[in-house]
From Swiss-Prot:
It comes from Homo sapiens (Human). It holds the Pfam family HHH_2. The gene is FAAP24. It is found in: Nucleus. InterPro entries: DisA/LigA_HHH, FAAP24, PND, RuvA_2-like. The keyword Nucleus applies. This is Fanconi anemia core complex-associated protein 24.
């Protein structure tokens, strides 16, 4: 996997309703959870972990990747710098990896401007990936990954659950925030003043600190 071809972030043909998966995921729990619900095509030499379409991919950061250090960053940067791809970063946020999450969050959301979705396990990740593929089968104008106005579809349930985890937000305020800021990227870039209009000053400061202050 070290000697990737120069065009390994280029467009890959993905049949409708399929996922093209990096060969390294063959036999994994994540792949097994998806098989039977979605059709997987395994290919070697890919920088992304999964292609949802020829121009939309998932970069998966495992608990082990996060604990091991910053080795995952090179892959994220390659996809971010590619003109061919829109990348979504999915990360395993567990008790073991939680302390490393803020650094990943800052790098992914603030430095690279990419969407970051934490999951608790590969089983939860499989549900998220399947949901994203189902959205890909819709016409492009209704695809939440291609249109900001439809981004709220992604919040059922994965993005919504992610926002609920932000200190001070909870189940009541999360939907209100997502109506005004329908993606993690938009929410993380919001000013305290903009957030105050939705959730009040105290919670706005908590949200802003969550995204901007590394722990």
């Amino acid at each position: 996997m070290e000697k990737n071809p120069p065009d390994d972030t280029g467009p890959v043909h993905v049949p409708l309703g399929h996922i093209v998966a990096n060969e390294k995921w063959r036999g994994s729990q994540l792949a097994q959870e998806m098989q039977g619900k979605i059709k997987l095509i395994f290919e070697d030499g890919l920088t992304p972990d999964f292609y949802l379409s020829n121009r939309c991919c998932i970069l998966y950061v495992t608990e082990a990747d996060l604990v091991a250090g910053n080795g995952y960053r090179k892959r994220l940067v390659r996809v971010r710098n590619s003109n061919n791809l829109k990348g979504i970063v999915v990360v395993e946020k567990t008790r073991m990896s939680e302390q490393y999450f803020p650094a990943l969050q800052k790098f992914t959301v603030l430095d690279l401007g990419m969407v970051l979705l934490p999951v608790a396990s590969q089983m939860e990740a499989s549900c998220l990936v399947i949901q994203l593929v189902q959205e890909q089968t819709k016409e492009p104008s209704k695809n939440p990954l291609l249109g900001k106005k439809r981004a709220l579809l992604l919040s059922e349930p994965s993005l919504l659950r992610t926002v609920q985890q932000i200190p001070g937000v909870g189940k009541v305020k999360a939907p209100l925030l997502l109506q005004k800021f329908p993606s993690i990227q938009q929410l993380s870039n919001a000013s305290i003043g903009e957030l105050e209009q939705v959730v009040g000053q105290a919670v706005a400061q908590q949200i802003h600190a969550f995204f901007t202050q590394p722990r």
